[in-house]
Structure formats: C-alpha cells, structure tokens
C-alpha cells in the first residue's frame, strides 16, 4: 500500500508540474470544450447590424459595452457622430430586450421605422412635433420606409415574412403604429386592466417630472425602461462637461442645459437642467394616491445611463409600517383654516396614519480623485470689477508649482516668471537630466489666470511668513491689531470676537479665504423622501403558475409514455413539444400514437412517423372522418382525417373507412364493375385512413390500397385519353386506344387488341367502366356508347379480380390475420430453391405459387418428367391467378417461389386464402425486392419486411461459378460455397459508344440483359432478339448471358451495393460478359473478380479441403475578396490543362467525319417516317475558309445540312424516347404536383389564381424583343384563322455542341435540332406566354429561388452571395439525360395546370394543348417527315420557361422545398442547397417511375450551374465560368475572319470576367476536381486565359489561316 500511495503522490506532482501528458490532454480538451460552448453561446446572441463607419477603438467600445449582442460592423455608412448614431440601434434593442415579447409597448419619442424593420407590430410610438427638427426627423423615418419598399420592388422581392404583420398593421392602422401627441396626451386606449410597457430612449428630458408618473399610470404601464445621456460632473456645478467616449458636450447656462457633439457641425439640443437633475436624483415618482413609480439605475454604458421605473401599489404595504404622526402640510393647512381654535385642535386635525420612506442615492465622482479646486480671477477694464470662478486642477501639478515658485527671491517673484514656469512644466519635465513629456495635461486656455492665482497665493504666503517671523521676533502690535483691539474694548465684550464673527458670516472677505484651495468630495448623497397616508390595505397578488404547471404535467406524462421506446435518445423531445404547441395537440395522445407507430401497431399511410407529421395528423380539425369522402391522395404529405378525430386517450382496434369507401357489398363479382361510374373507383377506395392492428394486418390493408390506387390511376388515365382525343389517327401505335362506336373505327389505334375492360363515354358524356367482348378485332359496344378508351393496363382483369377477392375476405374493411406458420427460406442465387420445392412438396395436399406463367409451366414440366402426372394447374398456380380465383380446397402446406418479390400484404393474403398450416416462402433477401409501381404510393420500410416465424438459410449455390461465389461472400452472412466446376466466368468490355452495338458487327452470345427499359427497347430496335431487363429475369437460369449498358449517364442501380448488379451477375452458369459504354462500379467488380488467383477460387468450392482466410488491407473555404489575376503563362498551359482533364480528346482527327458518314454505308434504326431521297444528294457549294486554332480540342468543323445529318440528329434528339414511367394517375398526380409547386415556390401573398389579361402593352413588350425580319413575316397575316398548331418545322444547328467528356473519342456527335412553329403562330401565342411567364416570375420567392430567365452572371452571383458558409449544407445537382424527348403526357399536364392557375384563356389553352399532343415534324432541307407524341420542342415559345418549370416541379415533388436554403433552375439545369443530414427519398427511382427521366443525383461540395462554378465562401459567393469550357471555345474551328474572332474575344471577356479575381482559385480547383477526376491545379491555365483574353494581339495569335 505504501508503494501504491507513493506512486499516486508522484503522479499528482507530475500532473501539477505539467509533465503528465494524459492530464495535459484532458486539460486541453476541457479548454477546447469550454471554448466551443462559449462560441456556440455567442452565436445564439441577437444579431445587430452596425453600418456606421467607426474607428477600431470605437468598435471595441461598442463590442465591450454590449456583450448581449453579436454586432456586425460593415462600415458602409459615413455619418456625423457615427458612434453615437450607431449606438442608438444597440440602445433601442437593449431596451426592447427588457420588454416581454409581444406585450403592448409605448416608445416615448421613438422611431417607428426601426420597429417596422424589426417586425414589431406591438409597439406604439409617441412622436410629438415639439419643434421643426422633430418634423424633419419624422419625415426621415418615412423616407427610410419608402426606400426600403422601393428596393424590394426593384429586386422583385416580397416583404419578408417576419416583417409582414408589422407592415400590414402600418398600412391598415397607422394610428396604432405612431401618433403626433406627447406621451402625456396620447389617445391610444387598451383593454382595461391590461398591463403595458414603455421605453424612453433619450426622450424623458422633455417630460416634466411632475407629469411623468401620472402619464405612465394613465397608460397602465407596468414598467418603463429609459436611457439618457448624463455625467456625474454635472452635479459638481460645472458649466461644461465633456462625454469623451461619444464625443459630446453638456454646457449649462442658468437652467438651460445644451447638448452638442464637438469636432463637427451638428444641431444643438436644449433641455431644462433642473428637470434632468430631478430625474437623476429622485427615486419616487408619484402617480396617484395609490400608485408610485420607483426608479432604480440598471447600468451605465458609453455615457448612457439606463434606469427602470416600476409601478408600485402602496396599498400592499404592510400595515405595521404606518405610524400616527403629523403631516406637516396638513398641519399648516389646518392652522390656516382654524387659527381661532386652539393649537391642540389644529394638531388633532393634522394627525394622520402615514408612511414615510427615505431613499438615499450616492453618486461617485471618479474623476475628482487627486484633484483640487483652484480659484481664478477675472477683471473688467470698463467697470473695474473683479469676478471669481473655480476650476479643478491636478493636485500634484498645483503643489509642484507652488512649492517651486515659493523658492523665488522677492525680485524674481513676478507674474511673468510664474507664467513662464507654469508653461514649461506643463509642456515638459526633466527626469535624470533628460527632457520628457509632462504627465499633466492642463488646458492652455487657463494657464494665464492659473499663473496669476499661483502668483497671488505665493505673494500672500510670503506676507504670512513675514508675519509669523515678526510674531516670533517682535512682541509689539501692528496698527491693524491696535484698531481691532480698540473696537473690541469699545464693545465691551458683547460679542466675544467680532472679527471672527464678521468673517464667518461672510460680511468681511479676507484674502486667505478668497485664495483658498479646496479638496472636492468623492461622493455626494441625494435624499428623496416619500410620505403616504394610509387609505386601504390589500393583499399582494402572487403569480399564477397553475397553467404552466398543468402543461408541465402533461408533458411529463407524455415523456413517461415515450420512455418505453428503445431509441428514445434519437427522438427530438424538444421538437415534439414545440410542434404539439403549434398544432394544438394533446401531448399524451400524441405520445400514445408515437409509441403505437414505433411498435408498428399503427401506421399513417401517407406520412413519415416524424414529430412534425404526427403533430400535423393529430391537429384538431373540423368535422368527422365520415365527412371526408376523397381520402386517397397520391402524395407524400396528403392530409388525412386520421387520429385527430379519435376519442381522446384511446387508439382504435380497427381502421376507419370513410363514407363511400370500399364496395357496397362483400361478395363483389367482376360483373359488378360493368357500367360503374369512374368516380366510384377513383375516389373513396382506401381501406383505412389509419392502419391499425398487427403488422400483418396493416400490410394486408396496404396491399388492398395499392391495388385500388393502381386501378384508380389506370381509370383516370383512360378518362384523360377520352377527353384529349378529337381527331382521327389510324396510323398510330400507342399504349392507349380510343374506339369511335358510331363510326366503327379507331380514333387512336392501340398497339394491342382484345382488352378485357375499358372506359366508355355515353351519349350524356358520362364516363363509366365497361367490360368488353371482341369480334374480329373490334370491341362489341352498346349503341348508347359514344367512345371507348382502352390501354395496355386494361388487357386483363388482374387488379379487378384481386380486389374482388381481397375485399370479399375483409369484412368491415378488416382482413383476418393469417395463422399459418411462416418459414422464410433465404437462399443465395442458384441454391436450388425450385428443386427443393419439387422434392419437398406433396402435390396431393400442398400448393405451389409462383410469380409468372413461365415459371409455373417449368415446375409442372419438371415435376412430371418422370412420366407420372403429379403437378397440374390446381396445385401449381401463379400468384395473380390464385388471388383472382382462389381454390376452395384447404391446403396443408404452401410453397411460394420468389416470395420476396411480392408485396408483403400479398404474401399474407396468400396464407389466408390457402388456409395452410405451414408456409415456406423462398426468396433472396439480397436480390431485387418488391418495387412499388404506383407513383407516390406509400410503402413504408417496416411494411417491406416479411414477418416470419422461422428463417432457414441456403448458402451453397448450384449455379454460380467460383468467381461469382467470391462476390457473393461479400454480400451474405456466412460462407457461400459453390458446386460448379467453372472457376472464371465473367468479363467486361468497354465499347466505344452505343453505335458500336449492332447484331451484325457485334453479335451477343446468350441471354441479353439490360438494366433499364430504355436500353432494352433500344437493343430491340437495333435488331437484337430475346432481350429482357435484369428485374424481369430474377429467378431464371441461363448458360450464357450478355449484360449491356447503353446509358452513359450515371445510374444509381449500377453500384457495388445494388441488388440489380447481384441479380445480373448470378443468372449464368458458364459465361457472362458485360458490355458498357462507360467505366462504372460493375466494371470494377468484374475487374476485381478477374484478378483473383486460382488458390482463392478453390476455397469457395464444396470439394475444397482446408480453407484459408486471407486478409488484404487496401493501400492506397457579403463581398468577394479581390486579388488581381496575374497575366502570365503561354497558350501551351491551356493545352496542357485541357489534355489533363480530357485525356485523348485533342488527338481526335475529326475533320472528315462528316464526309465519311455521307460516303460510306450506314445503318440507322429509324422510327416511322417519310423520307424524300431526292434530297440525299447535296448541291455542290463552295466551302468557306475558317481560321485554325493553335489549341487542339475536340471541336468539330461546321457541318452542312442534308438528309443524313438531319436524320441522325432527328433520331438522336427526337426518336427513341425513353419509357420508364410506372403507373401514374396523370390528372390527379399532376394536380398534386402543381399544388406542391405552388406551395414551394410561390410567395404566399400571390398564392391565389388570377385571370390573365392581354393588353396592348403586353403585346408591345413582346414585339419590341422581336427582330425586324420576324415582324416583316407578319405583314401579310390577317389573324382571322389559326394556322396548323400541330405542324412544326425541323432544322439543325451547323455547329456541334462540345461535350466536356470523352464520348467524342467513340461517338459521332449528332447535331442539335430546332423544332419550331411558324412566326404567325408565335405572334399569337408568344405575347400570351410572355405575359404568363412574367406573372409567374413575379410570384416566385426570389430571395430563395432563382428561375434563371434573362439574368446576368452578376445577378447569379448576387443571388448566391448570402450563403452562410458556416452552415452545414449539401449541394445537390440533378443530371438528366434526354431531357426534352423524355417529356410525355404527364409533363404536359403539369405545365398546363400551372398555366391554368395563372389564368390562361381556356380556348387558347385547349388549342395549344392539342397542338402539342400529336405533332408533325417536317424538315424541308432533308426531306424528312415524321410524327411525335408530346415531347418538348426545342424552338417553341415555351421551351425555356417550360423546361425550367418542369425541372422545378420535378424536384419539388421529391425534395422538401420548405427546408431548402437556396435553389436555382434553368432549363434542365438545377442546383439545390439543403441542410446537411436531411432525409431524402430515392430521387433516381422517383425521376424514373414518375417523371420518366434518366436522372442521377450528385452531392457536391461546390455547385455547378449553367456552365459556371458557384464557389461559396465565408464572405459570400463568386461565380466562375467553367475554364475547361472556355478553353474548348478557344479551340473552335468555325471562326471566319478577324472581325468574327474579335467578336468571340469580347463575348468570352464578358462571361470570364470573374477569372480576373484569383482569390478563390484554390476553391475553383476543388470544384473542377469534383467533376473531372483527372484534374490538376489550374491556376497557371487561368492566368494564361486572362492574359490572352485581355490582349487583342495575343488573342489573334491563337488562330492562324
């Protein structure tokens, strides 16, 4: 023990000496934590903007004086007395901090504009015009308001939300905001008994003290906070007092006290000195016989004194403090009234029960320390009179001078010598023989009178010294003494000493007193007395805490309820409390719902279980659930009348179904759908507004709702087709079709026949669902029908039949919970699941269910291959067949193959309908799960998990080779083994563009697989056979597979963790080859498998012996600072930079690619079109000569329009449109998307719908933007009839667009196309959509969202300049390929609904809509004519704004825009800044299924928008034009001559102006490296760009002939 104690003592000593590193680290960590806490606390302080230009010392004064605020010094405004003026805002904010927020407050003499800017709608300013200066000051306040409003109007920004209530109050009731009466006469009234507050900032000087208390009481002011300038020296009877910190002066003349700022010419303010002294020295301010306002000082800051006046009820004084005493005033009054009575009677009348209080106020004068009061004398030449005054001078200075000049001889003691010495010692002193600056800073103006006083005092001192010496040397009397002696003897001692008495009484002034030097007192005490007469006693009122205590009890109970949650730490209790208060929700009820949701006992179908969503769901609403008929709403935040209408404190045991929900009876036959109104199917089909019950029951309800939503979406789309089709189009082959019953022909021809059902329009234009029969390829229709619509989704009764069955077995909307035991068999790919099912099943009593027909036929064939018929269509069925026509048999066991690809509710219904005892669900947890195909339908994560009683695993694959088994081991728990003898089976090949893939030059061996439907259709059009997507072949086995990727844009489903990659690599048994146009994660996976050694591959075979585990570790920052970019470098620096970022592009010899394409044979996959081959031969033209660039890039020569060029461009830009969309109810979903768009982007003030009015001015605005040639084409247009709106002209741009990637090395880039209307159509619709665009942009919240239309680069930079770099945020970019041609009927519906909300004319809107539905393209140059459905036309009047609207609507439907910091949209470009950690949905899946976009979401550190890098930093943001794009333009090959070259230079100078600022080149390098992985530091190249752009001669050297 002794040794142990000794060790402890040694360690303690080492820690104390700082030699213990662990203790030092702990101490450093503690200091760091304390610093972080302090900085966080400081950042939460109120922020004050200090715009006045002040010095560094004054900045420290303001910061140290007001630590409560975080002061931002911008130094943007130079003004008189800038420090005092800037402190005014701090003083006002400090006073308002003392007032409870929202309480009615009187600002005595206040500035109402300051309160408006702060959004305080509860402040009334009493602003009397006591002189002309007050009127001018108040006009300045109004000017500030006008300037602010005009600035907002100029910037097209609305009044901010926090200011809106105050500005509305000022606009509607200005008399509440301010009045022109003094505070004592203010006429604003409040509710009786309501306490108010008051603040007085430098305004109580002008209120008489006698009126102040009564004025406060008249307004029922509880507390008044005041601030005023003062200085203690004013109590010393000084005529002038200087306030050094703010540079001001008080000057007293009689009772007038003047205040002014020195060192500048400003106004002078005059007040009553006696009135101010009373405010300073008094403590009690009587208001009535009952109430008194008690004053106490709070703090003194920068020459400003703060005090507080508190209303005191004297009736609450303790009775014992009163005493019977004589009130002096009453005594004198009684004596006057009754002088003839006795004194005793007068005393009795004056006796009262009174209370006396005495308050003493001490003032400390710190500047009088070491000071003395010295008299000064002035004489008048005219009158001969002498005046005397006093000043304070440094004590040490005075006695140093007096002691020195007392040493002068009588001849040397002259006034001139004294003045000379005083002047010299004031300016310098000699210390150790060295001259130094004097420490006494005495005013030079008083040195003359002060020297005279010193001279007189010294003279008097010499006389006194002589008298003393004579007293000691001679004992005789002087003549003066003899006179006094004679006078005293004559008076004979009546007064002991007449001389002393006369002097003491002031009748006689002696020299000693006139020249006396006095020492001032450091403290001065002022007493204030209060006398109260006893009138009444009342009890002191206590604070009412019952309400907050009751609320605390509720939240305590709610916390107790929430304590059962496992992850309570991650639950934001503070947010829960705040939202319950905002939504007016009972916390206990909300807590019960939270627990139920977290335990999966309750589910809000269309909401996430967050604090905000739960509070919103529980918010009290009007009416009951039965009143809400339209419950199904396809959006993520659809409002549900759910738990908020339940009985308080209880959770229901069953789901609530609104009126009209479900079907009228349980046993519904499919025939009941015939002639059923479409509204009955589209509305009210939700099983439950709130999912309750066990998790299995909730999954089953969700599955029924999923079928209902799918059917409703299909019916809605058929209704839309009926409304949209007007003309005849017998040549079309689309998914939808419309049959004209009366004419007996197809108005819109479908690509399939024999549909099971459709939607019919009868003679009354009523839409009903009809079941169809067919005769010779034509539907058999009732004669009362007008038209019938069908689609590919109505080919079979699938959804109807399943709904019939499932609703029949769900009485009262509550499906019974299945009791079967569920065994989940989780097997790796190829583990023999199907083989195991066939071996284990007893076909006489068991049932096998599979997803598709081919799988059921395969199982029947394999089970019966021995010759004995065991399997048939009764015991081996598809899931859809069984759900539509369930068997009446009772099965003992159920086997479901690929059960994890099914909706979990579907699996539970299969268990229920089969009535089995045990169910074996075979699947793979790592492969592709069930994918919800109905856009925006909720399928929560806890619903996707199958509830199983047992789980078995199969980890031996019979299909996969050894190299794939290695890949599987990284995906599954436990060791995965294989039985295959094949060791190496996978290869990857990067092809040089999708054009390299065709059946002739590159035949693909085995089953062809793709990841997307677009790639699948493109391969089929190229001529390949037997092509499927990976999702379609899950569960299948092939000997050889060929996986193809044609999409060059990033795909989220192709990643190392994607289940699609797992399925794709596990379909083969011997060989798999991956063909891709880009390097992607799957290439890396295959490359890793190819590098494996045979030793490692042997480990994964079942026959392998001892297994060896090898482990291999992987080896492997509001205004911009400006620094001028040096103009240095050479053009070769730009070449090097280009080659580093795009290696290989500069070596491409593409000058004759166009010639080669026209001369050689070519194979094109062309959609239906008409071609005039007479245009295939181009007329010979003289080729122009272009300048050649020194910088080698991938730029191409201009091309000549012709049949092949135009046709290739048309195929690339307009044909082969992707079709990725799932099942969407176009009309309803479009309405929801538009509402979300409106809520997200449009300012609430302009959220209503207006009627658009076309005026002459709007047409003139459009006409002024048109070229003269365009106006000339309209000269012969009579505007009587419309040209064909559905006919477009087609042309190409001659210059190919340069891509900043490596695709030029493998592809022949197609030209950009222009699809445009005639000028006559543009003249009609152009002004209309220009006006609609203007109306829309006016409504956009421009402070948060940027719609990049007619904006300059400087405006982009200004928009992003207020980004806070200290805030943790993420930057999102949505990259969409094939943007224009991906837009289909849904996109058009969204755009039209937005125009409708802006008030577009209905007739013109319908014409425009029909003109964009089915359109005809004619290319007269190439002789090509084709037909397109929908798509965005590149030369339309709505092309740019329409594309911008669509990308904004797309993102608002998937991203919570209310949480977005900044967002910008331009065409297909988008840039979004969101807080870091925000929970986002699957953007890529939403873009595919709902918006038909091939999209990829990038998360970056810096934004990239419209070819510019947005670099945000701690001072704002700077926008750099893409330097790589700039260098690419310097390598262009279409420059005609020197004039054209100079035009190019000027345009590049405009866009690249910010490259002149090199302060943020390091951040620019980081941003470029995010896009181009091979990027190097580019400062040298940027300097070279600026050098050549800024010099005409050097720029010309970049090109040669």
UniProtKB/Swiss-Prot annotation:
Pfam family, one: Vmethyltransf
Keyword hit for Acetylation: no
Chain residues that bind ATP: 827-834
Region: Helicase, residue numbers: 823-1076
InterPro entries: (+)RNA_virus_helicase_core_dom, Alphavirus-like_MT_dom, DNA/RNA_pol_sf, P-loop_NTPase, RNA-dep_RNA_pol_alsuvir, RNA-dir_pol_PSvirus, ToMV_Hel_N, Virgaviridae_RdRp
Region annotation Methyltransferase: where it falls in the sequence: 50-436
Alphavirus-like MT domain span: 72-280
CDD domains named in the record: Virgaviridae_RdRp
Annotated ranges, domain (+)RNA virus helicase ATP-binding: 795-954
Occurrences of domain (+)RNA virus helicase C-terminal (ranges): 955-1107
Any one Gene Ontology BP term: viral RNA genome replication
Domain of life: Viruses
Keyword annotations of the record: ATP-binding, Helicase, Host-virus interaction, Hydrolase, Inhibition of host innate immune response by virus, Nucleotide-binding, Nucleotidyltransferase, RNA suppression of termination, RNA-directed RNA polymerase, Suppressor of RNA silencing, Transferase, Viral immunoevasion, Viral RNA replication
Keyword ATP-binding: yes
GO MF entries: ATP binding; ATP hydrolysis activity; mRNA methyltransferase activity; RNA binding; RNA helicase activity; RNA-directed RNA polymerase activity
Catalytic reaction annotation: RNA(n) + a ribonucleoside 5'-triphosphate = RNA(n+1) + diphosphate; ATP + H2O = ADP + phosphate + H(+)
RdRp catalytic domain boundaries: 1369-1482
Family listed: Belongs to the ssRNA positive-strand viruses RNA-directed RNA polymerase family.
Subunit structure: Heterodimer of a large and a small subunit.
Protein name: Replicase large subunit
């Amino acid at each position: 023990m002794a040794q142990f104690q000794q060790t402890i003592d040694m360690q303690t000593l080492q820690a104390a000496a700082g030699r213990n590193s662990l203790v030092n680290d702990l101490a450093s960590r503690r200091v760091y934590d304390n610093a972080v806490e302090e900085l966080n606390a400081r950042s939460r302080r109120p922020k004050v903007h200090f715009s006045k230009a002040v010095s560094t010392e004054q900045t420290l004064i303001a910061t140290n004086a007001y630590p409560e605020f975080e002061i931002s010094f911008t130094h943007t405004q130079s003004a008189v007395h800038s420090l005092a003026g800037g402190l005014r805002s701090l003083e006002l904010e400090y006073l308002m901090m003392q007032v409870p927020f929202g309480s009615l407050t009187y600002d005595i003499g206040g500035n109402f504009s300051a309160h408006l800017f702060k959004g305080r709608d509860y402040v009334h300013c009493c602003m009397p015009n006591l002189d002309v200066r007050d009127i001018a000051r108040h006009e300045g306040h109004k000017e500030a308001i006008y300037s602010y409003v005009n600035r907002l109007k100029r910037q097209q920004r609305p009044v901010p939300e926090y200011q809106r209530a105050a500005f509305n109050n000022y606009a509607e009731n200005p008399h509440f905001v301010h009045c022109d009466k003094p505070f004592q006469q203010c006429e604003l009234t409040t509710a009786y008994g309501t306490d108010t507050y008051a603040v007085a900032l430098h305004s109580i000087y002008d209120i008489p003290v006698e009126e102040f208390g009564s004025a406060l009481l008249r307004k029922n002011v509880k507390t008044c906070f005041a601030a005023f300038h003062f200085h203690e020296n004013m109590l010393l009877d000084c005529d002038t007092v200087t306030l050094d910190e703010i540079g001001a002066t008080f000057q007293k003349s009689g009772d007038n006290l003047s205040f002014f700022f020195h060192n500048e010419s400003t106004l002078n303010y005059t007040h009553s000195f006696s009135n101010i002294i009373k405010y300073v020295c008094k403590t009690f301010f009587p208001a009535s016989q009952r109430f008194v306002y008690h004053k106490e000082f709070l703090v003194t800051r920068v020459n400003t004194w703060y005090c507080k006046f508190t209303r005191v009820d004297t009736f609450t004084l303790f009775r014992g403090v009163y005493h019977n005493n004589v009130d002096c005033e009453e005594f004198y009054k009684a004596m006057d009234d009754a002088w003839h009575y006795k004194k005793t009677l007068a005393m009795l009348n004056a006796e009262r029960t009174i209370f006396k209080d005495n308050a003493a106020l001490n003032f400390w004068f710190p500047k009088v320390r070491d000071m003395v009061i010295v008299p000064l004398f002035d004489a008048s030449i005219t009158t001969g009179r002498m005046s005397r005054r006093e000043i304070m001078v440094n004590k040490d200075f005075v006695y140093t001078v007096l002691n020195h000049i007392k040493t002068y001889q009588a001849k040397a003691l002259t006034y001139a010598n004294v003045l000379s010495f005083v002047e010299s010692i004031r300016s310098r002193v000699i210390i150790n023989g060295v001259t130094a600056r004097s420490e006494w800073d005495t005013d030079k103006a008083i040195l003359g009178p002060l020297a005279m006083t010193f001279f007189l005092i010294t003279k008097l001192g010499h006389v006194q010294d002589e008298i003393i010496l004579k007293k000691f040397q001679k004992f005789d009397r002087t003549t003066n003494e003899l006179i006094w002696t004679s006078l005293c003897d004559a008076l004979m001692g009546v007064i002991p000493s007449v001389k002393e008495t006369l002097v003491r009484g002031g009748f006689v002034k002696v020299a000693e007193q006139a020249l006396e030097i006095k020492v001032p007192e450091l403290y001065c005490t002022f007493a204030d007395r209060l006398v109260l007469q006893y009138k009444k006693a009342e009890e002191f009122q206590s604070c009412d805490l019952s309400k907050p205590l009751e609320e605390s009890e509720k939240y305590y109970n709610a916390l107790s309820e929430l304590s059962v949650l496992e992850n309570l730490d991650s639950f934001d209790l503070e947010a829960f409390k705040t939202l319950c208060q905002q939504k007016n929700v009972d916390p206990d009820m909300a807590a019960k719902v939270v627990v139920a949701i977290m335990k999966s006992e309750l589910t809000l179908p269309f909401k996430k279980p967050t604090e905000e969503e739960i509070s919103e769901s529980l918010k009290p609403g009007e009416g009951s659930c039965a009143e809400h008929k339209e419950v199904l709403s396809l959006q993520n935040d659809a409002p549900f009348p759910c738990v908020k209408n339940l009985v308080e404190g209880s959770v229901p045991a069953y789901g609530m179904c609104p009126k009209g929900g479900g079907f009228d009876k349980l046993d519904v036959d499919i025939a009941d759908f015939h002639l059923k109104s479409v509204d009955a199917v589209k509305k009210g089909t939700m099983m439950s507004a709130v999912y309750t019950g066990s998790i299995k029951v909730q999954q089953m309800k969700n599955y029924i709702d999923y079928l209902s939503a799918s059917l409703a979406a299909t019916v809605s789309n058929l209704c839309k087709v009926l409304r949209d089709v007007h003309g005849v189009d017998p040549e079309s082959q689309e998914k939808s079709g419309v049959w004209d019953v009366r004419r007996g022909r197809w108005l819109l021809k479908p690509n399939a026949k024999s549909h099971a059902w459709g939607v019919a329009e009868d003679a009354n234009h009523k839409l009903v669902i009809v079941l169809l029969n067919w005769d010779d390829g034509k539907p058999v229709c009732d004669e009362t029908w007008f038209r019938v619509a069908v689609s590919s989704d109505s080919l079979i009764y699938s959804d109807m039949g399943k709904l019939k069955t499932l609703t029949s077995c769900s009485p009262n909307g509550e499906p019974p919970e299945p009791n079967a035991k569920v065994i989940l068999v989780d097997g790796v790919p190829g583990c023999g699941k199907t083989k195991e099912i066939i071996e284990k099943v007893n076909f006489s009593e068991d049932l096998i269910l599979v997803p598709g027909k081919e799988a059921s036929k395969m199982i029947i064939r394999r089970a019966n291959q021995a010759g004995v018929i065991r399997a048939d269509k009764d015991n081996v069925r598809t899931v859809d067949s069984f759900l539509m026509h369930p068997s009446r048999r009772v099965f003992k066991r159920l086997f479901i193959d690929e059960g994890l690809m099914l909706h979990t509710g579907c699996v539970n219904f299969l268990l229920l309908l089969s009535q089995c005892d045990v169910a074996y669900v075979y699947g793979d947890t790592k492969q592709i799960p069930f994918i919800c195909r109905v856009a925006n339908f909720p399928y929560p994560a806890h619903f996707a998990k199958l509830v199983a009683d047992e789980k078995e695993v199969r980890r031996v694959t019979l299909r996969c080779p050894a190299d794939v088994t290695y890949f599987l081991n990284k995906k599954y728990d436990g060791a995965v083994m294989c039985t295959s003898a094949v060791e190496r089976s996978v290869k990857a090949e990067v092809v040089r563009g999708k054009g390299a893939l065709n059946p002739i030059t590159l035949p693909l061996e085995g089953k062809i697989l793709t990841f997307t439907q677009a790639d699948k259709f493109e391969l089929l059009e190229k001529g390949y056979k037997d092509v499927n997507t990976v999702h379609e072949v899950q569960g299948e086995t092939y000997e050889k597979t060929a996986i193809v990727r044609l999409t060059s844009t990033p795909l989220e489903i192709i990643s190392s963790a994607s289940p699609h990659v797992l399925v794709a690599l596990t379909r083969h048994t011997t060989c798999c080859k991956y063909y891709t146009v880009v390097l992607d994660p799957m290439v890396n996976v295959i490359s890793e498998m190819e590098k494996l050694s045979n030793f490692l591959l042997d480990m994964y075979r079942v026959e392998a012996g001892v297994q060896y585990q090898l482990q291999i570790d992987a080896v492997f920052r509001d205004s911009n600072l400006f620094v001028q970019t040096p103009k240095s470098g050479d053009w070769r620096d730009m070449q090097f930079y280009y080659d580093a970022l795009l290696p290989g592009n500069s070596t491409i010899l593409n000058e004759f690619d166009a010639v080669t394409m026209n001369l050689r044979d070519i194979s094109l996959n062309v959609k239906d079109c008409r071609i005039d081959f007479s245009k295939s031969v181009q007329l010979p033209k003289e080729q122009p000569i272009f300048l050649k660039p020194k910088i080698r890039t991938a730029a191409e020569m201009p091309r000549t329009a012709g049949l092949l060029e135009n046709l290739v461009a048309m195929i690339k830009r307009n044909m082969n449109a992707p079709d990725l969309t799932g099942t969407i109810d176009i009309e309803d979903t479009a309405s929801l998307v538009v509402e979300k768009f409106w809520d997200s982007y449009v300012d609430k003030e302009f959220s209503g719908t207006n009627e658009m009015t076309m005026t002459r001015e709007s047409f003139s605005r459009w006409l002024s933007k048109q070229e003269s040639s365009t106006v000339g084409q309209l000269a012969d247009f009579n505007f009587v009839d419309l040209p064909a709106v559905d006919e477009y002209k087609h042309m190409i741009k001659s210059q190919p667009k340069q891509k900043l990637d490596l695709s030029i090395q493998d592809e022949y880039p197609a030209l950009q196309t222009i699809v445009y209307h005639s000028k006559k159509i543009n003249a009609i619709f152009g002004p209309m959509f220009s006006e609609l665009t203007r109306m829309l942009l006016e409504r956009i919240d421009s402070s948060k969202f940027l719609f990049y239309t007619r904006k300059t680069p400087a405006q982009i930079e200004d928009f992003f300049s207020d980004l806070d770099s200290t805030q943790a945020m993420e930057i999102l970019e949505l990259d969409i390929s094939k943007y224009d041609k991906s837009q289909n009927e849904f996109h058009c519906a969204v755009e039209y609904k937005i125009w409708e909300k802006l008030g577009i004319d209905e007739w013109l809107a319908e014409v425009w809509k029909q003109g964009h539905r089915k359109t005809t393209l004619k290319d007269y140059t190439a002789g090509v004519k084709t037909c397109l459905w929908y798509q965005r036309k590149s030369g339309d009047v709505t092309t740019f704004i329409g594309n911008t609207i669509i990308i904004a609507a797309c993102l608002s439907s998937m991203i919570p825009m209310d949480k977005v910091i900044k967002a910008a949209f331009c065409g297909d470009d988008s840039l979004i800044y969101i807080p870091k950690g925000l929970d986002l949905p699957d953007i890529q899946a939403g873009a595919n299924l709902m918006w038909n976009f091939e999209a990829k979401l990038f998360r970056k550190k810096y934004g990239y928008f419209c070819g510019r890098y947005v670099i945000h930093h701690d001072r704002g943001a700077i926008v750099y034009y893409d330097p790589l794009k700039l260098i690419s333009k310097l390598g262009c090959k279409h420059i005609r001559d020197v004039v054209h070259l100079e035009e190019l230079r000027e345009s590049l100078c405009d866009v690249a102006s910010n490259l002149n600022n090199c302060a943020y080149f390091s951040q620019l390098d980081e941003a470029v490296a995010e896009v181009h992985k091979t990027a190097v530091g580019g400062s040298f190249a940027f300097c070279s760009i600026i050098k050549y752009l800024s010099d005409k001669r050097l720029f010309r050297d970049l090109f040669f002939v």
